Amino acid sequence: MSGDGLQAPYASPDPPGRDDWRTTFRPDIPSSARIYDYFLGGKDHFQADRDAADQIAAYLPNMREAARINRAFVRRAVRYLVSEAGIRQPIDIGAGLPTMGNVHEVATAAHPAAPGSYVALTHGTADAAPRARDAARVYDAATTRMFVRSRAEVLALARGLDAVEPGLVWTPEWHPEPGEQVPARPSDCYYYALAARKP
């Protein structure tokens, strides 16, 4: 059971013998942040992260592109929420490692007085890619549990919030930049995207 009260059917228990795995730096154990860095073409990852990323990509062949599109959504959402919706304090939960176009950089560019906080969500799903459950198990063996949720479960996470148009959509469909190519099958990006504000 996750903290939101929803069943997390694809998560496994903590890996055996890893009582200290969350507090000790272990480059031999994959990290979700470093895996994401690898998918984004970054430099801050180790062989264990690359191996785990390759396993994930075997299940989800578009994962590198999905990570890039997911990151682009974060930038678009922050830019919109700061410049259009008046949000002044964006918060990026599960941000991964620092990379170009961080939330605070985008927020400051959109509104120089913005201290840096917003509500935007991307969430992995198996709705269009059942093998995402297998990829989630690779993350489970690393330092972070991965939960893939259905559209209804992601909407339940945002209950009580006012969604920004277009609501919950695939990441490349949320306010694409002018000239930005939206894939023919947006669901191949494996993530839902939503921006919302607390009423």
Question: Which sequence ranges carry the predicted segments?
Answer:
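Short Gly/Pro-enriched turn/cap motifs at secondary-structure boundaries
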Residues: 27, 145-146, 184-187
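Short acidic/His/Gly/Ser-rich catalytic and metal-binding motifs that mark active-site loops
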Residues: 46-49, 128-132
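A structural signal for short, well-ordered beta-strand segments and their strand-loop junctions
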Residues: 91-92, 120-122, 165
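Core SAM-dependent methyltransferase catalytic element
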Residues: 167-169, 173-199
